[in-house]
Design a protein with these regions (language model features):
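Short, solvent-exposed mixed-charge patches
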Residues: 616-618
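Charged, often flexible domain-edge or linker segments that flank or initiate folded functional domains
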Residues: 80-88
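Membrane-proximal helix-loop-helix interfaces that form the catalytic/acceptor-binding platform
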Residues: 6-17, 21-81, 109-477, 483-614
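Thiotemplate assembly-line natural product biosynthesis machinery
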Residues: 103-107
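N-terminal membrane topogenic signal
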Residues: 2-15, 93-101
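Interfacial transmembrane-helix boundary/kink motif in multi-pass membrane proteins
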Residues: 87-97, 317
Length: 618
């Protein structure tokens, strides 16, 4: 009995339980914050993070004390020894030449993605920078600005919009504070795009290593090199391997999760199970919307664990799987509890309401396979490329490539289900995206195609599995086709992403003011800028905000009185159609002169700049 109590698992979980229990007993319940939250909710106002966060951290702590008790209760199961591997299949190695090809692929990706590091941030990136990383700028009544650092509580828990991919944002802010030095010159950058994109670029490089390691774990090493070379040309690499969002981290973490699960099932070792649990938490911390991937991967794990013929191995692995997921749950609850209510509020707003039609599925398949859409999304926009109408080769060739790339993935599925040790993997490889799509259908939402990014690793793995089963000559013939198909299909889209920003916010602001740096002593003098929805954000924090045509007219009168030029900088004309009076005013050539239309690389990222004619002579 005493020896069981001294078991490392028992001692560690009992220790965790008592640490959490003592913390709960010592830390005061945030009663004042609870009252303040209740008061603001009763008034129909949003609670401040200062009061909201302590309330939910305390509630999360209460739940975690109970979950820690469950960890202790699992001791009879979790402390069992693993007498043999639960999953057959030793780790395979890549040859030196194959590693060189993987390294070459990573280098090609880095060269193609590097030009995007310094591009202007686009809408979601800019919103993340403005709310969670860059210094906060307050526009005073006299037009001057006050600047203060962003509080870390905003970085960690500001979830008014799900643009805050928290696990990424923390890393991005640390990079930004380490690499960026503020200046006071007229056009010195107020923040650094490169600094916040660099960790994503590094994670993109990590995709290649993580895919290779994952495939070695599962015994698919032979197919890695050609898929790595194809991956280097995928337009989603150029986009999401650089974008200042958490999607680059998501892809890396999904590759790691599949590899960690493989090692955990093969060895039963605690380090792999705990690593699996930690990686799951980090994936959800980066992007809660990626939950479909770990859900289906865990279902895969359950099937694999309970299909083992050895009862002792089944019980031992089941215990470790439960502990790993309990650790994930405790970390999610302990760290992310404060975002629960804003996340639910966002879902209730139904920002992506709609339905999935054939066009959506065709675009989704095209994006997933090569990173470019099948249909053109913007008539007259030079950035609106598509495989059907604007690809490097003809529409017929593009269709052939897509069909054959899909067929190669189908071969991968066929090979997976033929092997007893991997027969459950399609639950994740196919079931993951199927669950996300089912969720969208039931919820009557029309998600962006990039919401499929958590399953992009599944496609890559299916290609690897398919190639790994070919003999040498067939492997390299099929591999060469894969590389050519992806690179040729994605060429135009990748080239456009390298050449120009997705949204030219920085460039639009430069058209309106000579002094663009809020830290300059003469900032906001001799000029007025105005913006409403889809505003320039932290590129132009001195812009006066308006919500109605009356407020815009007040700014026009103010510009007349002060005899300074007034510019209006706005994006996504479709959204302004919900403010028809404002749009009619801005489109009146007697009142406003069109300065520029800056095309964007997405339906909502074209920007327009107009100048009020009443002050044009000044």
């Amino acid at each position: 009995m005493m020896s069981r109590l001294r078991h490392p698992y028992v001692m560690s979980t009992v220790g965790v339980f008592f640490v959490l229990l003592i913390t709960l007993l010592v830390v005061d319940r945030p009663v004042k914050s609870e009252r303040e939250v209740q008061k603001r909710v009763a008034l129909g106002k949003k609670p401040t993070l200062k009061h909201h966060v302590p309330v939910w951290l305390w509630r999360g702590l209460c739940v975690n004390v109970g979950l820690a008790g469950v960890l202790v209760a699992l001791a009879p199961l979790a402390s069992r020894r693993v007498t043999r591997s639960g999953l057959d299949g030793p780790e395979h190695r890549l040859k030196v030449g194959e590693w060189l090809m993987v390294a070459t692929a990573a280098g090609v990706f880095a060269l193609s993605a590097a030009p995007r590091l310094s591009h202007s941030l686009w809408g979601d990136e800019e919103n993340l920078m403005q709310t969670c990383i860059a210094d906060q700028v307050t526009l005073n009544a006299d037009g001057s600005v006050s600047i203060a650092p962003t509080a870390w509580i905003e970085t960690l828990w500001n979830y008014d919009r799900p643009t805050n991919h928290m696990g990424y944002t923390v890393v991005a802010r640390l990079f930004h504070e380490a690499l960026y030095s503020p200046g006071s010159g007229a056009t010195d950058a107020f923040f650094s795009e490169t600094a916040v994109r660099l960790p994503v670029l590094l994670s993109g490089l990590g995709w290649f290593w993580a895919m290779a390691w994952c495939c070695m774990v599962w015994g698919w090493a032979r197919g890695v090199a050609p898929v790595a070379l194809a991956l280097a040309g995928h337009a989603w690499m150029v986009r999401y391997g650089v974008d200042a969002r958490g999607y680059g981290f998501v892809v890396l973490l999904v590759f790691l999760l599949v590899g960690l699960l493989g090692r955990a099932l093969q060895t039963g070792a605690w380090r792999w199970w705990l690593g699996y649990g930690l990686a799951q938490f980090y994936l959800l911390w980066v992007h809660p919307g990626a939950i479909h991937a770990p859900v289906m991967l865990n279902l895969t794990a359950v099937v694999m664990v309970f299909s083992d013929s050895d009862k002792s191995a089944r019980l031992a692995l089941a215990g470790r799987w439960m502990v790993a997921n309990l650790c994930t749950a405790m970390l999610v609850i302990g760290v992310m509890a404060p975002i629960l209510t804003p996340f639910i509020a966002f879902l209730k707003r139904r920002a992506l309401a709609g339905s999935l039609d054939l066009d959506w599925f065709q675009d989704a398949a095209s994006y997933l396979l090569v990173g470019a859409p099948w249909f053109s999304w913007g008539a007259g926009n030079r950035f609106s490329t598509s495989l059907r109408d604007g690809a490097l080769l003809s529409r017929e060739w593009m269709l052939v490539f897509l069909v054959l790339l899909s067929a190669l993935a189908g071969v991968g599925i066929w090979r997976v289900v033929r092997e007893r040790r991997t027969v459950a993997l399609p639950l994740f490889l196919i079931g993951g995206p199927a669950l996300m799509i089912l969720h969208a259908v039931v919820g009557e939402t029309r998600p962006y195609q990039w919401y499929l990014l958590p399953f992009f690793p599944a496609l890559c793995l299916l290609w690897v599995i398919a190639l790994a089963g070919f003999k040498r000559r067939a492997l390299w013939s099929a591999g060469a086709f894969l590389v050519a198909g992806v690179h040729l299909s994605a060429w135009n889209q990748s080239k456009l992403l390298q050449e120009a920003p997705i949204e030219s916010i920085r460039e639009s602001v430069a058209l309106t003011r000579k002094i663009t740096n809020p830290r300059h002593p003469d900032y906001n003098k001799g000029v007025m800028t105005a913006a409403s929805v889809m505003n320039p954000g932290c590129y132009d924090p001195g812009a006066w905000r308006f919500k109605s045509v009356d407020e815009l007219r007040v700014l026009m009168n103010k510009a007349d009185g002060s005899r300074v030029p007034l510019f209006v900088n706005f994006g996504f004309r479709g959204l302004y159609e919900t403010m028809p009076d404002v749009l009619r005013l801005l489109d009146d050539p007697q009142l406003f002169e069109r300065v520029a239309v800056l095309p964007g690389q997405f339906v909502s990222t074209t920007r327009e700049v107009v100048r009020y004619r009443g002050t044009a002579r000044h």
